[in-house]
Structure formats: C-alpha cells, structure tokens
Amino acid sequence: VESFNGRPMLFINGEPTTEFWCYGDPGAIEDFVSAGIRICQFHVPFPSWWTGPEQYDFGPTDEKIEEFCARAGSVLLMPRVNFGYVGEEWWGDSHPDELAVGLDPDGKPVDYRQVRSLPVGCWFSSGSQEWTRDAARAMHAFVTHCEERFGDRILGYQIGGGISAEWFRWWYFVEDVYEDYSPAAREAFRRYLRNRYGDDMALRRAWNRPDVCLATAEVPSPRKLRQPAECYFRDPAIERDVVDWLECLSEANAGQIMTLAKVAKEACRWQKLVGTFYGYLWPHWNTRSPARAGHMALRRILNEKAIDFISSPYHYDNRHLGGFHHSQTVPQTIERAGKLHLDEIDTSTHLAKPPRIAGRSCGLPRNAEESCRLLRRDAASVLGTAGTGWWMDLYNDRWYADLEIQAEIRRLQRLAVQSREWDCDSHAELAVVVDDRSSAWCHPTSSLNQFFTSVARQMEWSDLGFPLDTLTAWEVGRYGRARVYLFLNCWFMDGDLRREIIQRVRRPGVTSVWFHGCGFIEKNRCDVANVTELVGIRMRYLPEPALPEIELIPGSDPVVEDAYTPRSFGARLSDDRTDRMLDGPAAHWDAARTPRFAVDDPQARVIGRYVGGREPALAIVEKQGWRSVFCGAPMLPGWLLARLARRSGVHAYTSPGAQVFHRGPLISVYKPQAGLLRVEAPAGMLIQPLMFAETQQVWRPDPRTKPCASVETPFEASETRFYVACDSSGRELPMGAAGNRSAE
C-alpha cells in the first residue's frame, strides 16, 4: 500500500489499482470472474489447520486454493485466517488459566460452552502471553507454507480472532456476563497498570483508593462494569479502575492483532498485504460498546506498520431497499492514517435464502433489478468515502449467480478502476465526530450508545442532500475543515484535546452542534462546567435520570418555522423504524435513561425544551462569527439539521430526500423514493451526468448533456446516478478512460 493521487492505494506488481474484490468459495468464483473481479477473499476451512503444539494440517487449505486456481486461473487470493474456532480445543484444554472467564452480575462463573453462539473452540484471553506466543508461531508457519506453495497466487492475509473473527472479545455477545476474570487477564491488567502509573502512590491517587497496590490490583467486579455511578456516565473520582480495565482490554486485544500481523509480514518478507477487522465505532443492538468489544485502540492499530488495511461490514440497521450504506468503522480516518479501508459489502441479493440474510428481511430485493440498485448504492458509498470493498457471497449460496447482477458488478468495477486517476479530496462541508475512548466512560449496554451515534445517522441524517464526512475526536484539530461539526458521543475530553477542538470550532463561519454531555468528563472529575467551557453556553446539570426527549418551541427561531410533525424527538423509536433495525430485545430500547443538561444562559436562543418539563434543552448562541448549538437529546431531525447546515453555508446539492457523496470529481446521488430531483453543482463548478458506454466498457460524461450548474432528472425508487464535476470553464476532468485493464 503506497500513496497515489493523494491517497493510500493498493499496488500489485508495481501497478496501482482501486478495483473491487470479492468474497466467496470456489463454487462461486466464476460468478465474480465473469463480473471482472480478480481478487477473492475466502475463509480458511474449519476444523482449524492448527492441530497441536507446532502441529499443522494444511491439506484442506491447499485443496481449497487448488480448486480456486482450477476454476479461475488468474484469481488472486486472500485467505481469512481465523483463530479460536473449532479444532483448537486442544489449546484451551492444556491452558485452562489462559481462557477468558466470564462472570454474571453476582460474580458467578458462566460456562462458555453453554452460551457460545458460534463454533468456538478456544476462547483465549486477550491477556494471554502464552496464546499470543503460540499463535504467532502458527501464523508464521501458515504464511510460510502458503508463500512457498502458492506465493504467486496469494495477495495477502486477513487475520481474525474473537467473535465472528472481528476481534470482538469472546463474551461480548453474551447478555449480562462480563469479562475477563482469568489469571491471564489479571496479570495483563497489572502489567498495564505498572506501565501506566509506575508506582503504588500514583495508582492510589488515580483510583482515589489508599489500599490499592500494583501487585494485587484486581479486574473490577461485574457489578461495577455493569452500572456506572452516574446512571449513564462513569465518575473518574470513583471509577477510574473500570476505565483502566476497559482500556487495558482494548490495548491487549490490539496487541494480539499487531503481534500476528508483524509475524505474517515477516513470513512473507513484507511483500503481501496484511489486514484485520477493527474499529467498530458505530454500534447496533449487540455491539453497543466498543469498550466491551475491545475496539478502543484504533490509534494503536493505525500506527502499526505491519497492518495495511482495516475492514468491516457496513452497518446492519436500515440497510436494505430504501435504506443506506454506512460503515461500522471510520473509513476516512483509516485512509488519513495511510491505510486501506476494505468495506465488506454483504448485501443480500434476491438470491439470498431467508433466514440466511444479512440483517433484517425488511426491504429485501425481490428481483435482479432491485438487487442491482442496492449494489450500485453500495458502490456509491464506498467510492464516495474511502478505500474499496469486496462483494460478499456471505453464506456461499451464490448470491451473484445472475447475469444482470454480474453485468452491473462489471460496470461498477470499471468505475472503481477509473477512479484511480482522480484526486480524492472530499467536498463534504459537514463532519460528524465520534470518539472511541468515550465508550469506556458510559453505560456499556444502554441504547443511548446507539441513539447518539448510529441510529441518528442511519435514520435521520443520510439523505439531507449534501455529503457528510466522519472524524474521530482526536482528528478534529488536525484535519477539521468543515463548516458544521456534529459532536455525537464525545463525553470524555482531556485538556489538550479540549483546547484543540475549541480552537478549531471557535472560528468565523463555523457551526458546532454538541449533543448531551459532550466534554462532561475529564481526567479527574465529572463537571457541568466542562460542558459549559466546551459548548460555549452556560449549562446546568439535571441529575435525575430521565429519557432525553425534546419538544420544539414554535416561533422561537426561523429555523423551526413550519416545523415538520412530530415536533418532538429523542431516544425513542417509532414502529416503522423498529422494523428497519437489526433484531434485538424490545426491552433494550426502553433503557435510555440518563442525567441531562439544561441551558442556563441568557445569551442563548432557546428553541426546544425537554418533554415532561420546561428545562431548556435545545439552544443556539452566536459569538464573533461562530455558532454553537446545544442539543440535549439524540435524533436531531434531519430537516432541522439541513436547515442549520444551509444557514451555515453548507452547499445543498439536492433537496432533502437524497444521499449525496462528492469525492474528487465523482458525485453520486441515491434517492430512496421515486421522483424528480434537481442536482446543483457547488459554486465555481459545473456537473454532467455520467453514462456507461457499453462498447468501450468505460464511464463517460453523457454527450447529450453539456456541463451545467444544475441537472434535473427523474429517479426511480432506490436509484443511484453518477455525475462528474468540472471547473466553471467546463474543462473536463480526467476520466481515466485507459484505466487498469488488468483488473479485468
């Protein structure tokens, strides 16, 4: 992976490429090769090839690779090497103290074999140095074998472990059980504390406990992990031990990934790709806490030279027909760190066989035409954010065994290949800001973790008619160039980060929207004064837990005039939206209570109050050319956000109701509902529709339409259209007509 045209790009034999990949088994490889795909990821067969201490059976893996080669002579392969699954029971049997231990809220051990939902054989502790050492030897042996026998056919290796091979900790999906209470985890925690604090006195000051010692510190109890002291928030004065443990869990998890990645790189002499799943910061119902998952150490992963790419499936909520495609990780952050993001496009086509589908059945495509519309929407999202992706035959049921689908994939492959020649600058003027570390400072299972992040994005903010960028909180000071920032879950903010963000947003022309308790927690205390400092509006703390909901005040500001109904919003799902969420316990959605924050500033213009009370909960203040908005509840309505964005100078490409991406010269517009739509170019630019020239197999500006400031086009339901932007002189930007034909 090297930089090319301003972004990290995959090089194969010295040639840069931006092509899509696929995932599947040999039985489906012809479906993808027919569609112009030449890179295929596949699962290494179970039971595990790692059969004993430095004992390996590569036979089934060899047979699978040989079958790929026989069916598709030019395919390049990416084995997905997963640790901990069936066939590795022998390791746990001989190292019982190195397995992750889960306890229920009463501190009673739970038998993992009775609650596991996947064929897990060895649920190794993230703190196990013995497992890491042995697995590293096995990883080296696997890569060495593959390179010696199939080196010219292997593109690289994806390393998996934990639940779903996505490095979720083993107990993460088990309701109301907490980890890790194994001897290995306890010793790892003590090592972490020694590295962090150095001596007992520093530890005692941090934990505010005179009796604690580095040599005897224990993993916090399940009850402490389960319930924060401040209902939703953790108090650093009395819960620093909990946060230290959760940070240790992620650090150890990342450490195992990094060790295996380095060994794999060494075994292939740094000539092949190595990547992993990681950084899932956008939760759904059973991934509610990156802290519990072990996914808070993204910065460490991004700094590891042995890791070339990071991948994740796209989000499972509201993803089918009429829904939207967004990553579960942070693709732009990954790209800014110089690594590839690989989007796992596990879209269910009309050939999927219920219940073997990805996500809920609501909105499944009924035919090839609807399948193609979903896949084009997916491609638009990937090309409009960062990196590339693989088309996934998730259950090896041949979801792509359709000539219409294969023709569409070939068209999208050509567009991806052509994009190699384009610059990659994002034209988004609104950025949503998420924070991985803050997940350690809040309730691990509250639905508020979703409401303040992914539910709002998936349900309210996707189709506002302008593109969105994503930043992590620690990137705002360096990369923030937006007109509008939405700070979603930035509960914890230390002094340096706080100063960087304030310096970035307190500038003329910048609007910042702060949700709930952004900045409430710092290193040593929870304090409403922290919120006041960050938001720039004087705030008051309401300690009584309540459901955060806001009712708009008619006539309070032009931005809420002629407000859409309902006039209230917050941590509550309507029935039609529940149908578009990934399945989960209904009771989960009723657990969204939290202390709240009220505006107490005469200079602020209050436009909304909490439902069930009169406390000001939504307010705007304008000072020295910058604007700050406090919003005490999640799910700020999309129409209201669109109005705030327009007031702040954000260019609207379309009216609300369409999802827009604009990266380099490529503009994509996806419209869930059928209807006429006008697409308007940003100031100083012209746009022209793109069309696919079948005879040349290339995307071209439509010769029937000249570059112009706006284009009006009828859209079918769930249709995506592509446009190319050029400067106001009409000078055509490079379309990469030559492309990389080797990708086909």
Model-based region annotation:
Residues 1-36, 418-421:
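N-terminal carbohydrate-binding accessory modules
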Residues 16-23, 43-59, 115-137, 236-255, ...:
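The substrate-binding groove and active-site-proximal loops of carbohydrate-active enzymes
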Residues 18-22, 40-42, 77-81, 155-159, ...:
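Hydrophobic faces of well-ordered beta-strands that scaffold small-molecule active sites
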Residues 22-29, 295-301, 459-479:
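A short, well-structured beta->alpha microelement
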Residues 28-112, 133-134, 141-149, 259-268, ...:
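Aromatic-lined substrate-binding rim segments of carbohydrate-active enzymes
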Residues 93-309, 313-316, 324:
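Polysaccharide-binding and catalytic clefts of secreted carbohydrate-active enzymes
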Residues 270, 275-456, 462-463, 541-593, ...:
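Hydrophobic targeting/anchoring helices
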Residues 371, 488-744:
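A conserved amphipathic helix/loop scaffold
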